[in-house]
C-alpha cells in the first residue's frame, strides 16, 4: 500500500484531499481512492506507474474515454478518479469531480488536436438545417454518407414507448429522436417496438392513407431517361420501394430537394397522435380537482390531458381559462375568483399554494371556533333584564358586592327584619312559599297564606257550620271495612275449645 499511495505525496496529496467527490457534497478524496484506482488499472492491462505523471494519466484517459458511455459504474468512477489525479499533476485548481472532468476534456481536445489534423475534405460536417437533418446523414469528402442509428437511440425510443404507454410525451420524444433521420432509420425505430402492435397497425393505416394522398397530389411523370433520379412516390417516402441512397439524394440534391425524412416523420406523428387519443380517452372537461388534491397536481393533470388534445390554439387558450377554474374544488375556486378576469397561471399557482393543507385547515378551524364561542345578540327584553341585574349585599345593603366580600362590621340578628333570636332563613316576615311556611305542626298548603297584621280583625261575618258533602266512595270503603271486621271476628275460635276437641279424640285409640 505504501508504494501505491506514493503516487501523490506531500503537497499533491494535500491538494487531492481538498477536492470533493460531488458538487456541494461533504465527502472528499482520500489516498484510499488512489489505491483503489491503482488496483482497477490491472483489469485493463495498464501499469500503476502511469498514475505518477501527467502524461501517464493522459494515456489512461485515452484508453478509458471511449468506454465511458457504455461502461459500468466502476469504470466511470475510475475515469473520474484519473481525471482528478491528472488535474493535480497539471496543477489545475478544481473543487469537485465534475469540474475536473470538464478541465480534462478541454485540455485533451486542445493538446491532441485530432480535429485539426484531419483533412478538410474528410472532416464530418452536418448539412444546413434548412436542407434536412444533420444526423445520421453526414458529409464526408464532399459526399453524403449514411450512418446507422446508434443502439442508445433505439434503446431510448423503446423505453419511452414502454414507460409512457403512448402518452402525450411519445410524440415529442419521437420528434427529438428522429431528427434528421431517413425513412429507413424511422422504419428501424418502428420495428424495434415489440409490444403495442395494435398501435403500430393504426400507424401503418395512417401511413397508407397519407401515401395514397401523396400519389394523388403528385402524379408520376412519364418514362425517364436512363440514369436520371425519379420523383419519390408515397411508397418511396415510406421507405418500402426506395433505397437509402435514393432517400439521401432526394433530401440533399441541388435542384428541388424533397425532405422525404421530414414528410415521413409528419405522417407518423399523425398516427402517434391518434394512438395518444386512443390510449388516453379521458376528456379534458372531465378532469376535476379532488377535495384534498393540491392545486399544482391538478394543474399538472389538466395540462397533461390538454397536451393530448388535438385542438386549435384558441380553443386550448379558452380551456386554460374557463374549465381550469370551473373544475377546481370549492376552496381553490373561491380563491381563483378573487383574482379577477383572466389571471395568469403563475398568479393562480401562487394564490392557491397551501389551499387545503394543514395551515389553511387550522385557520378555518380557528375562525369557526371564534364564531362558535362568540356570544350572539340577546333579545331586547333579556338585554334589559340582564342590564338591570346587580348584586346586593345583605350585610350593609349596598350594591356591587356580596356579604362575603363586605368590609363593614357584621350585622347581628336577622338580615331580613333586623330582630335578634333567629336567622333570615327562619324569619317569620319572609315571603311565604307556594306550600306555606313549612310542614311543621300542620299540613302543607297548596296556596299562599297571606299574613294578617296584628291588631286587625276580619270584618266579614263568620261562616256557618255545614255538613260535609257526601262522598260515595268513602261510604263504600267504610262499609267494606266494617264487613271485613265482622268476618275476622267470626273466624276467631277460642283456644280452649280447640284443645277440648283434641282431648276427646283419645277415646278413638282406646
Swiss-Prot record:
<dbReference type="GO" id="GO:0008270">
    <property type="term" value="F:zinc ion binding"/>
</dbReference>
<comment type="similarity">
    <text>Belongs to the primate lentivirus group gag polyprotein family.</text>
</comment>
<keyword id="KW-0597">Phosphoprotein</keyword>
<dbReference type="InterPro" id="IPR008916">
    <property type="entry name" value="Retrov_capsid_C"/>
</dbReference>
<dbReference type="GO" id="GO:0020002">
    <property type="term" value="C:host cell plasma membrane"/>
</dbReference>
<keyword id="KW-1188">Viral release from host cell</keyword>
<keyword id="KW-1048">Host nucleus</keyword>
<keyword id="KW-0677">Repeat</keyword>
<dbReference type="InterPro" id="IPR036875">
    <property type="entry name" value="Znf_CCHC_sf"/>
</dbReference>
<dbReference type="InterPro" id="IPR050195">
    <property type="entry name" value="Primate_lentivir_Gag_pol-like"/>
</dbReference>
<comment type="function">
    <text>Matrix protein p17 targets Gag and Gag-Pol polyproteins to the plasma membrane via a multipartite membrane binding signal, that includes its myristoylated N-terminus. Also mediates nuclear localization of the preintegration complex. Implicated in the release from host cell mediated by Vpu.</text>
</comment>
<feature type="site" description="Cleavage; by viral protease">
    <location>
        <begin position="447"/>
        <end position="448"/>
    </location>
</feature>
<dbReference type="GO" id="GO:0039702">
    <property type="term" value="P:viral budding via host ESCRT complex"/>
</dbReference>
<keyword id="KW-0479">Metal-binding</keyword>
<dbReference type="GO" id="GO:0042025">
    <property type="term" value="C:host cell nucleus"/>
</dbReference>
<dbReference type="Pfam" id="PF00098">
    <property type="entry name" value="zf-CCHC"/>
</dbReference>
<keyword id="KW-0543">Viral nucleoprotein</keyword>
<keyword id="KW-0449">Lipoprotein</keyword>
<dbReference type="Pfam" id="PF00540">
    <property type="entry name" value="Gag_p17"/>
</dbReference>
<dbReference type="InterPro" id="IPR008919">
    <property type="entry name" value="Retrov_capsid_N"/>
</dbReference>
<feature type="short sequence motif" description="PTAP/PSAP motif">
    <location>
        <begin position="458"/>
        <end position="461"/>
    </location>
</feature>
<keyword id="KW-0946">Virion</keyword>
<dbReference type="Pfam" id="PF19317">
    <property type="entry name" value="Gag_p24_C"/>
</dbReference>
<dbReference type="GO" id="GO:0016020">
    <property type="term" value="C:membrane"/>
</dbReference>
<dbReference type="InterPro" id="IPR000071">
    <property type="entry name" value="Lentvrl_matrix_N"/>
</dbReference>
<feature type="short sequence motif" description="Nuclear export signal">
    <location>
        <begin position="16"/>
        <end position="22"/>
    </location>
</feature>
<keyword id="KW-1035">Host cytoplasm</keyword>
<dbReference type="GO" id="GO:0019013">
    <property type="term" value="C:viral nucleocapsid"/>
</dbReference>
<keyword id="KW-1032">Host cell membrane</keyword>
<keyword id="KW-0694">RNA-binding</keyword>
<keyword id="KW-1043">Host membrane</keyword>
<protein>
    <recommendedName>
        <fullName>Gag polyprotein</fullName>
    </recommendedName>
</protein>
<keyword id="KW-0945">Host-virus interaction</keyword>
<dbReference type="GO" id="GO:0005198">
    <property type="term" value="F:structural molecule activity"/>
</dbReference>
<dbReference type="Pfam" id="PF00607">
    <property type="entry name" value="Gag_p24"/>
</dbReference>
<dbReference type="GO" id="GO:0003723">
    <property type="term" value="F:RNA binding"/>
</dbReference>
<dbReference type="InterPro" id="IPR045345">
    <property type="entry name" value="Gag_p24_C"/>
</dbReference>
<keyword id="KW-0167">Capsid protein</keyword>
<feature type="short sequence motif" description="Nuclear localization signal">
    <location>
        <begin position="26"/>
        <end position="32"/>
    </location>
</feature>
<dbReference type="GO" id="GO:0075523">
    <property type="term" value="P:viral translational frameshifting"/>
</dbReference>
<keyword id="KW-1198">Viral budding</keyword>
<keyword id="KW-0862">Zinc</keyword>
Amino acid at each position: 500500500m505504501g508504494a501505491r499511495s506514493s503516487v501523490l505525496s506531500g503537497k499533491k496529496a494535500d491538494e487531492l484531499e481538498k477536492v470533493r467527490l460531488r458538487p456541494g457534497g461533504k465527502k472528499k478524496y482520500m489516498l484510499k481512492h488512489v489505491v483503489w484506482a491503482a488496483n482497477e488499472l490491472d483489469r485493463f492491462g495498464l501499469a500503476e506507474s502511469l498514475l505518477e505523471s501527467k502524461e501517464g494519466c493522459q494515456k489512461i484517459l485515452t484508453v478509458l474515454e471511449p468506454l465511458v458511455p457504455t461502461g459500468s459504474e466502476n469504470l466511470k468512477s475510475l475515469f473520474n478518479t484519473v481525471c482528478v489525479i491528472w488535474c493535480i499533476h497539471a496543477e489545475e485548481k478544481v473543487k469537485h469531480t465534475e469540474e475536473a472532468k470538464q478541465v480534462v476534456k478541454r485540455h485533451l481536445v486542445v493538446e491532441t488536436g485530432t480535429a485539426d489534423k484531419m483533412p478538410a475534405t474528410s472532416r464530418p460536417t452536418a448539412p444546413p438545417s434548412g436542407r434536412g437533418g444533420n444526423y445520421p446523414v453526414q458529409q464526408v469528402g464532399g459526399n453524403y454518407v449514411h450512418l446507422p442509428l446508434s443502439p442508445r437511440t433505439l434503446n431510448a425510443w423503446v423505453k419511452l414507448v414502454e414507460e409512457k404507454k403512448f402518452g402525450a410525451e411519445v410524440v415529442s420524444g419521437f420528434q427529438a429522436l428522429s431528427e434528421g433521420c431517413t425513412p429507413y432509420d424511422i422504419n428501424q425505430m418502428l420495428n424495434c417496438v415489440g409490444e403495442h402492435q395494435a398501435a403500430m397497425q393504426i400507424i401503418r393505416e395512417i401511413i397508407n392513407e397519407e401515401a395514397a394522398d401523396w400519389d394523388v397530389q403528385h402524379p408520376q411523370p412519364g418514362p425517364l431517361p436512363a440514369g436520371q433520379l425519379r420523383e419519390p412516390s408515397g411508397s418511396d417516402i415510406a421507405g418500402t420501394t426506395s433505397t437509402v441512397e435514393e432517400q439521401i439524394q432526394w433530401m440533399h440534391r441541388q435542384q428541388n430537394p424533397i425532405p422525404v425524412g421530414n414528410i415521413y416523420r409528419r405522417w407518423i406523428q399523425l398516427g402517434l397522435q391518434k394512438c395518444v387519443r386512443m390510449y388516453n380517452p379521458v376528456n379534458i372537461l372531465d378532469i376535476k380537482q379532488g377535495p384534498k388534491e393540491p392545486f399544482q397536481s391538478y394543474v399538472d393533470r389538466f395540462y397533461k390531458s390538454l397536451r393530448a388534445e388535438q385542438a386549435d390554439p384558441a380553443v386550448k387558450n379558452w380551456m386554460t381559462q374557463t374549465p381550469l377554474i370551473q373544475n377546481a374544488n370549492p376552496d381553490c375556486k373561491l380563491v381563483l375568483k378573487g383574482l379577477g378576469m383572466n389571471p395568469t397561471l403563475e398568479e393562480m399557482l401562487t394564490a392557491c399554494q397551501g389551499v387545503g393543507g394543514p395551515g389553511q385547515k387550522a385557520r378555518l378551524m380557528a375562525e369557526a371556533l371564534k364564531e362558535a364561542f362568540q356570544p350572539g345578540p340577546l333579545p331586547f327584553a333579556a338585554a334589559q333584564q340582564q342590564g338591570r341585574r346587580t348584586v346586593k349585599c345583605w350585610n350593609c345593603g349596598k350594591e356591587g358586592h356580596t356579604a362575603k366580600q363586605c368590609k363593614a362590621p357584621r350585622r347581628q340578628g336577622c338580615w331580613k327584619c333586623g330582630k335578634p333570636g333567629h336567622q333570615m332563613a327562619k324569619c317569620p316576615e319572609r315571603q311565604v312559599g307556594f306550600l306555606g311556611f313549612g310542614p311543621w305542626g300542620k299540613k302543607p298548603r297548596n296556596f299562599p297564606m297571606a299574613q294578617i297584621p296584628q291588631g286587625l280583625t276580619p270584618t266579614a261575618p263568620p261562616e256557618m257550620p255545614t255538613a260535609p258533602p257526601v262522598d260515595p266512595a268513602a261510604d263504600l270503603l267504610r262499609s267494606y271495612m266494617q264487613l271485613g271486621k265482622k268476618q275476622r271476628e267470626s273466624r276467631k275460635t277460642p283456644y280452649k275449645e280447640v284443645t277440648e276437641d283434641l282431648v276427646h279424640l283419645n277415646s278413638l285409640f282406646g
